[in-house]
C-alpha cells in the first residue's frame, strides 16, 4: 500500500458541510508530524464474524477502557443512534433517507440506490450516534464498500451542532483514495491528510484517537496521520457519524449501480 501524506491548511468561509458552504480563501502547508509506533486494535479473529474479525478486546489499548461496542448481532439500529433525512448541507442535489439504513446478517448497511419515492434519484443513507456524545476517546469502525460511486464518510461532529469543529477520519473520494480532515476556528481552518493505495472494497478497520493535544488517524492498527497543531484539536463533546454521499449533480461520486457501505462493528475506548 502506497502511503501519501499531505497536510494543507485552508481558510474557508464559515459555512460548510451539514448546512454550510465552503469558500476557499488561502492555503498553506504544515510540517509533518511523527506518527506513533504503538499498534492499535484491528479486531479479534473470529470465523463467525462477517468480516472475520470481531470487535477488539476490552484491554486492546493500554490505559483505555472499552466503553461502547456495536456488532449488529440483533436486527435493529442500536440505541443512541439517529437516522438522517433530507439534503445534506454542502452537497446540493444529494439526498439521505432513513429507509436506506438497516441491519442485516450481522452488518449495518447504508444503501445507495435509485429510489422511486424520490423521483428515481440516487439516494443514500447516514446516521449519527447523537445520543452518546463524548469528550475525547478512541473510535474504531470496521467497514467496506461494495463498489465505486458514493463516498464513505466516518467522522466526529460537535454534539451541540455548533460547527466547526469536525474530525473526518475516513472520507473517501474513490475506492482507493481517502482523506482525513480536521476543521476548526471561526474561519474554518482545515488540515487535511491523504491516503492513497488502500482498497475500500475490502474490510478495513478505520480509527481515530482523539486526546486533548493530538488527533491520530489509524488504519488496520497502524497510525497513518496525526494532527498536533495548536487550536486544531477540539475540546468539546462530539458524536460519531457514518454516511454515504453522492455528488451526481456535478458528475462526481455518482454510482452506476446500487452500492452499499457495510459496517461489521464499532468499538469506542476512553481513558481510565
Predicted segments with their positions:
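C-terminal region of N-terminal signal peptides and the immediate post-cleavage residues
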Residues: 12-38
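GH16 jelly-roll
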Residues: 2-5, 9, 22, 35, ...
